[in-house]
Amino acid sequence: MPQYKAPLRDMQFVLHELLNAEEHYAKLPDFQGNVSRELVDQYLEAAADFCENELSPLNQVGDREGCTWNDGVVTTPTGFKEAYQKYIELGFPSLSAEEQYGGQALPNSLGIAISEMVGSSNWAWGMYPGLSHGAVRTLEHHGSDEQKNTYLPNLVSGVWTGTMCLTESHAGSDLGIIRTKAEPNADGSYAISGEKIFISAGEHDMAENIIHIVLARLPGAPKGTKGISLFIVPKFHVNADGTVGERNAVRCGSIEHKMGIHGNATCVINFDQAKGYLIGPENRGLNCMFTFMNTARIGTAVQGLAASESSFQGALTYAKERLAMRSLSGPKAPEKEADPIIVHPAVRNMLLTQKAFAEGGRALVYLLAQYADIVEKGETEEERKFADNILSLLTPIAKAFLTETGSESAKHGVQVFGGHGFISEHGMEQIVRDTRIACLYEGTTEIQALDLLGRKVLQTQGAMLRDFTKIIHKFVEANKDNAAMKEFVEPLAALNKEWGDLTMQIGMRAMQNPDEVGAAAVDYLYFAGYITLAYLWARMALVAQEKLAEGTTDVDFYNAKVTTARFYFKKILPRVRSHVDVIAGGLDPLMSLDAEHFAF
């Protein structure tokens, strides 16, 4: 099993050199003078030590043992509970929460870097505290003062954990047809009845209470998504003094037997007139839940990045050690019986693809986290609105594109190992299994694609897209006369223009038949993802070239950055052409076959 090593050098490069984190924090009033480079690095180093030495050794244990269910009680794998207690002691759950509830009020963009390390070392374990973060955010934004005071201190400290209860057996992506009911009680609370499925971390032994955030319908509520409300439903009631009281009528009916993430309990949760409390206005639950869902979607993008990073680390180590055949251009290790497989172009192609997706994905996720900082803490309404537009556009791209490329990277990891990659003990096939869910939960790739093209681009008449393409255009204009950047800037400029043209073409076709949006959406998302990473790789190449010109002593690191950027532009970015061609194929090839003729 590959042992995870936190890529601190690259994380610091993205935070401090590419995204200028210290300057970013200085522009946000809540963080001015409070968040230095030294403080950020201290947290990163502490998290790296925890993830490398506590979580990584438990990754394969969790996969092998899984969770066990016995009469509604779920037991997590060996070591999970103890690792979680240490996580609490180190203060990581409270990192970005508000101080008045026991939080440290540090930036989300620092928290996302720590989440990357947790996810890369042990994704299944990381889902337990990760979902709590979404619950905290939802209550901070939409809860009443009483609800915040009751639930946030223990959620923030990590003593309690949270869940997101949306899905029902008949209602996954289409939440408008959920059936869980909420009947008003005389005391102002609600009796919640129904069954939710696929609830990650829905029951476990790692915390003394679990706070479920639940979507349900009130009596007489409008049909569809306009009739959904949001509720707090604790596993145990909370006494007036904040202590845990009697058990609520919430029970885990079973846990799923899954392809991957065995260490995380994926639960069927039954609510039998469980007492719940309304969050926000009646029938506005989906609006409130989007706070949780958007947090979860960025978190899932981190899973894609984590898959690329962890599979790259395992494959790289193996490729340097495994001997097979001689290089086609002559022996590279003549003293050995064969050359290391890293000398072979096909192996290098897979390794560089993993590296390009991991490092490009890191830049994208950290950029999103900075925009999230501005949305919450920006000084002016104009700044917050602009950041929210960019964040809204890039979130479906990051969630879908990074999880799909993470899955690709994981498969490359198995392929580099050859037959050994198929053997469980090496741990590479676990990454494939654990990562596959990332393309499904928190909105499938296809749902994210519809969100991007339909809601974020076409419904805004391209306003959000123009905000982002203007950023790319500004970068292109600033560097068009830089000879060293020509190989990056020229193709980026052309594709940036094509992005707008392609959008207009799809929009015109969609005016004739709205199904054209569905036909084009996934390829459009891939097109957008490849360009977005190209923009970030061009920025990284520029920073690296500037450091090399200054005479840095870290020559190898910066040369590798430029070389990987060149690989991305020459070997990965050309994939956009196939997506453009597929979009041009239109709707008819998909819809001309009658449903009854799909036969076997």
Stretches found by the model and what they are:
Residues 32-34, 65-75, 285-299, 313-354, ...:
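Glycine-rich cofactor-pocket loops
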Residues 198-200, 236-253, 258, 265-296, ...:
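A glycine-rich, basic-preceded beta-loop-alpha segment at the flavin cofactor/substrate interface
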Residues 1-126, 150, 373, 582-600:
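Amphipathic, small/basic residue-rich leader segments at the start of a protein or domain
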Residues 459, 475-600:
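C-terminal amphipathic alpha-helical interaction region
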Residues 2-5, 184, 261, 367, ...:
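Alpha-helix capping/hinge segments and adjacent helical runs
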Residues 133-135, 144-147, 442-444, 452-496:
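A structural-propensity feature for long, helix-poor, extended segments
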Residues 189, 193-247:
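A short core secondary-structure module
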Residues 80, 128-132, 143-185, 195, ...:
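Internal maturation/activation junctions in enzymes
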